[in-house]
């Protein structure tokens, strides 16, 4: 049987298939469909210091090759997560990664410090790239020097592995990744959803509760794949590929492009066992190709 284990920083993953934040709830919601022990890791829904109500409905609109969402980072807050959700997750033999955010940099630091002290949380994913927040909040992921300051200050306060989730709508995503690396991030995940909109031609208003949302699903996969390939060449820290992955073939493309691991997002809504099928598909590919260790194909793209 081929070896599927990969390492991100000092953290080992039994396989490179993780869930994407915001598409797998807090794990409990999918536990009736998926044996969570099988997964390489679970990235839970983005958490803030206090509960957030999120954006007004409607929040989701299906597109021909994906969907536009405007959830607005609704969540139960850090303390409720620790009391109500984390005890369940700790029962499983898989890595728990908490995606987190703040309304300002001080709040980012506060959430990160509390998560760093929380038993059962293996790594943190810092969300600096959600398109469904105010422009002031979003600047951190779009402006190099603001990103640098944010990573530097958060890193000072935590010891656990830090993953930074990058925005696609920047001029040089490789530059942003290098900044993360220089300031001590252990890995980068990319890409987040792409800012998008949809209009009702009769009312001439947005068909979601906000003016714009974030596009995800197969429509963004080629964009994400190119970004992963570009970033993987620019940094030495691990890259986690995200964006439109629905099959083992999709996942393998990201690994070949240089991703150390991948996250499955929108596919979970369509097929609750997508992650398991992708893991099995990767395993079968390696057997058929007589590849003993998945690390042999990571970054094996030929120009």
UniProtKB/Swiss-Prot annotation:
Which positions in this protein are listed as binding substrate?
45, 69-73, 127, 192-193
Q: Could you name the domain of life of the organism this protein comes from?
A: Bacteria
Gene Ontology biological process: 'de novo' pyrimidine nucleobase biosynthetic process; 'de novo' UMP biosynthetic process
Under the heading SUPFAM superfamilies, the entry gives:
FMN-linked oxidoreductases
> Pathway it belongs to?
Pyrimidine metabolism; UMP biosynthesis via de novo pathway; orotate from (S)-dihydroorotate (NAD(+) route): step 1/1
| Compartments where found | Cytoplasm
Q: How is the cofactor bound?
A: Binds 1 FMN per subunit.
Active site per the UniProt annotation: 130
Quaternary structure and interacting proteins, as annotated? Heterotetramer of 2 PyrK and 2 PyrD type B subunits.
**Protein name in UniProt:** Dihydroorotate dehydrogenase B (NAD(+)), catalytic subunit
Organism listed in the record: Thermodesulfovibrio yellowstonii (strain ATCC 51303 / DSM 11347 / YP87)
């Amino acid at each position: 049987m081929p070896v599927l284990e990969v390492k991100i920083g000092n953290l080992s993953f039994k396989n490179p298939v993780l869930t994407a934040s915001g598409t797998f709830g807090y794990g409990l919601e999918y536990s009736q469909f998926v044996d969570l022990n099988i997964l390489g890791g679970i990235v839970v829904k983005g958490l803030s210091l206090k509960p957030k109500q999120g954006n007004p409905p409607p929040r989701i609109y299906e597109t021909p090759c994906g969907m536009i969402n405007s959830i607005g980072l609704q969540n139960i807050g850090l303390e409720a997560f620790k009391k109500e959700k984390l005890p369940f997750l700790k029962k499983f033999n898989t890595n728990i990664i908490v995606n987190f955010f703040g309304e300002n940099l001080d709040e980012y630091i506060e959430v990160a410090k509390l998560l760093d002290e929380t038993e059962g949380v293996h790594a943190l994913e810092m969300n600096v790239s959600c398109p469904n927040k105010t422009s002031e909040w979003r600047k951190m992921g779009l402006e190099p020097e603001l990103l640098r300051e944010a990573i530097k200050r958060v890193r000072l306060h935590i010891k656990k592995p830090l993953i930074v989730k990058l925005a696609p709508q920047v001029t040089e995503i490789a530059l942003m990744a290098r900044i993360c690396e220089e300031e001590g991030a252990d890995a980068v995940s990319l890409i987040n959803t792409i800012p998008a909109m949809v209009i009702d031609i009769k009312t001439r208003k947005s068909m979601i509760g906000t003016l714009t949302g974030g596009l995800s699903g197969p429509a963004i996969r080629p964009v994400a794949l190119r970004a992963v390939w570009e970033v993987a060449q620019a940094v030495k820290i691990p890259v986690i590929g995200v964006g439109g992955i629905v099959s083992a073939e999709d996942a393998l493309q990201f690994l070949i492009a240089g991703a150390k691991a991948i996250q499955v997002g929108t596919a979970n809504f369509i097929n609750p066992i997508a992650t398991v099928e992708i893991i099995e598909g990767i395993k079968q590919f390696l057997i058929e190709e007589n590849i003993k260790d998945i690390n042999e194909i990571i970054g094996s793209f030929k120009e």
